């Protein structure tokens, strides 16, 4: 990762070498610190995450692993915590053995002697500087290839810097000051427990929301699939009901319909003609009856007229016979008047008879008697 891991030991200072040849020895290698639980998990899954995300940077991969670590349950994290605690106990025992080892004790003695020599040399140099004496003398170089510019202010500052860092590293080393992260107070534990509870509540809430979202999604998906199936079924049904247009069949149906319409029209015309004939046939018998009645009445009228004519003929013969015997002009005139009166009476009777016949004939108002019959 980009930052230096917190579990790595502080860098050991480089051995300081003064112009007088005093060298501070390097300490022996201490035992390695145990890996923190997160770093154990990171080392375990690093290659897997790197293989699945080859294009990501190191800090992005570390961010992904951090999220995976936070998502682990307490039971899964406990495995790494147990390993860390076991190795930490071994590390403390190794550190005790390391501090009591002959190499470390020799390093402490050599270090103290070198520091004492350096302090003595620095005091002497300081005193010479206060007295104004030069702190070094120029002598001819025995080896021209061995170039030495002397003990400058830069070298002094470097020595002081390294010394200060050594002191700070010794003061703040684990052998003196315990790691703050390894010491958990009761108040801190209570705070952590409350944080864990709040995080668990928040996690359960998020899980419930995720379940609701998933249920809604599944419901929408189900409705969408159902609507799709119904649409496809309806489409198939409509495609099955598709009617192919056959122009020849349509033309045949049109011709058949026209033929049926023509036949119905002929039937209607025929029915109308038959009805007219029936109406005329019903009128003709009535006219015949009326004509027969008129003829009968005429015959009845003709009979009295014939009797009258015979009577008139008899009277005329009698008159002629009388005239032949004893006829007078006055008798002739009276006889002629009697004939005329008889004719007038006959004509009046015939007129009354014709009027009665016309009254009986005029019963059907729709069919008047023809003029020829009236004339007869």
Curated annotation (Swiss-Prot):
Q: Which GO terms describe its cellular component?
A: nBAF complex; npBAF complex; SWI/SNF complex
Instruction: Cite the Pfam families for this sequence.
Output: HMG_box
- A single GO BP: negative regulation of DNA-templated transcription
Q: Does the keyword Phosphoprotein apply?
A: yes
**Cross-linked sites for Glycyl lysine isopeptide (Lys-Gly) (interchain with G-Cter in SUMO1):** 57
Q: Where is this region: Disordered?
A: 1-36, 118-140, 261-376
Entry-linked InterPro entries: HMG_box_dom, HMG_box_dom_sf
Covalent link location (Glycyl lysine isopeptide (Lys-Gly) (interchain with G-Cter in SUMO2)): 3, 57, 96, 111, 131, 242
Q: Report the PTM annotation.
A: Ubiquitinated by TRIP12, leading to its degradation by the proteasome. Ubiquitination is prevented upon interaction between TRIP12 and SMARCC1.
Locate the DNA-binding region by residue range: 31-99
State its location(s): Nucleus
Disulfide-bond pairs as recorded: none
Q: Which GO terms describe its molecular function?
A: DNA binding; N-acetyltransferase activity; nuclear receptor binding; RNA binding
Per its UniProt entry, which superkingdom is the organism in?
A: Eukaryota
Q: List the biased-composition ranges (Basic and acidic residues).
A: 118-133, 261-277
Q: Which residues carry this modification: Phosphoserine?
A: 230
Which intervals carry biased composition (Polar residues)? Answer: 317-328, 347-359
Q: Provide the alphabetized UniProt keywords.
A: Chromatin regulator, Coiled coil, DNA-binding, Isopeptide bond, Methylation, Neurogenesis, Nucleus, Phosphoprotein, Ubl conjugation
Q: Write out the coiled-coil annotation as residue ranges.
A: 187-283
Please tell me whether the keyword Coiled coil is annotated for this protein: yes
Q: Which residues carry this modification: Omega-N-methylarginine?
A: 4
Subunit composition and interactions: Component of the multiprotein chromatin-remodeling complexes SWI/SNF: SWI/SNF-A (BAF), SWI/SNF-B (PBAF) and related complexes. The canonical complex contains a catalytic subunit (either SMARCA4/BRG1/BAF190A or SMARCA2/BRM/BAF190B), and at least SMARCE1, ACTL6A/BAF53, SMARCC1/BAF155, SMARCC2/BAF170, and SMARCB1/SNF5/BAF47. Other subunits specific to each of the complexes may also be present permitting several possible combinations developmentally and tissue specific.
> What's the entry's take on its domains?
The HMG domain is essential for CD4 silencing and CD8 activation; mutation of this domain blocks thymus development.
| Function as written in the Swiss-Prot or TrEMBL entry | Involved in transcriptional activation and repression of select genes by chromatin remodeling (alteration of DNA-nucleosome topology). Component of SWI/SNF chromatin remodeling complexes that carry out key enzymatic activities, changing chromatin structure by altering DNA-histone contacts within a nucleosome in an ATP-dependent manner. Belongs to the neural progenitors-specific chromatin remodeling complex (npBAF complex) and the neuron-specific chromatin remodeling complex (nBAF complex).
How is this protein named in the record?
Answer: SWI/SNF-related matrix-associated actin-dependent regulator of chromatin subfamily E member 1
Q: What is the lineage of its organism?
A: Eukaryota, Metazoa, Chordata, Craniata, Vertebrata
List the gene name: Smarce1
């Amino acid at each position: 990762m980009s930052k230096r891991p917190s579990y790595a030991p502080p860098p050991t200072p480089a051995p300081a070498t003064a112009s007088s040849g005093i060298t501070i020895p390097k300490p022996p290698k201490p035992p390695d610190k145990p890996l923190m639980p997160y770093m154990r998990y990171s080392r375990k899954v690093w290659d897997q995450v790197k293989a699945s995300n080859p294009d990501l940077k190191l800090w992005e991969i570390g961010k992904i692993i951090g999220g995976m670590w936070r998502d682990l349950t307490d039971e899964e994290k406990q495995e790494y915590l147990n390993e860390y605690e076991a190795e930490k106990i071994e590390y403390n025992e190794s550190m005790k053995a390391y501090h009591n080892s002959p190499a470390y004790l020799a390093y402490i003695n050599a270090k103290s002697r070198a520091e004492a020599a350096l302090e003595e040399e620095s005091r002497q140099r300081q005193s010479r500087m206060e007295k104004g004496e030069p702190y070094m003398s120029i002598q001819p170089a025995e080896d021209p290839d061995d170039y030495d510019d002397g003990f400058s202010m830069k070298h002094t500052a470097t020595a002081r810097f390294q010394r200060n860092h050594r002191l700070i590293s010794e003061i703040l080393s684990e052998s003196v000051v315990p790691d703050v992260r390894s010491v958990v107070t009761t108040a801190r534990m209570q705070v952590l427990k409350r944080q864990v509870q709040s995080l668990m509540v928040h996690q359960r809430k998020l899980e419930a929301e995720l379940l609701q979202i998933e249920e809604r999604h599944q419901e929408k998906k189900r409705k969408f699939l159902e609507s799709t199936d119904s649409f496809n079924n309806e489409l198939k049904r409509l495609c099955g009901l598709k009617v192919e247009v056959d122009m020849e069949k349509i033309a045949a149906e049109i011709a058949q319909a026209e033929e049926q319409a023509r036949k119905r029209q002929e039937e209607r015309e025929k029915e109308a003609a038959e009805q007219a004939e029936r109406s005329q046939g019903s009128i003709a018998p009535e006219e015949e009856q009326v004509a027969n009645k008129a003829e009968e009445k005429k015959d009845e009228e003709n009979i009295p007229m014939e009797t009258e004519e015979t009577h008139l003929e008899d009277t005329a013969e009698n008159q002629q016979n009388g005239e032949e015997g004893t006829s007078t002009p006055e008798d002739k005139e009276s006889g002629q008047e009697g004939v005329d009166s008889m004719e007038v009476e006959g004509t009046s009777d015939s007129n009354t008879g014709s009027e009665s016949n016309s009254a009986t004939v005029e019963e059907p108002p729709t069919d008047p008697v023809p003029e020829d019959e009236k004339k007869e």
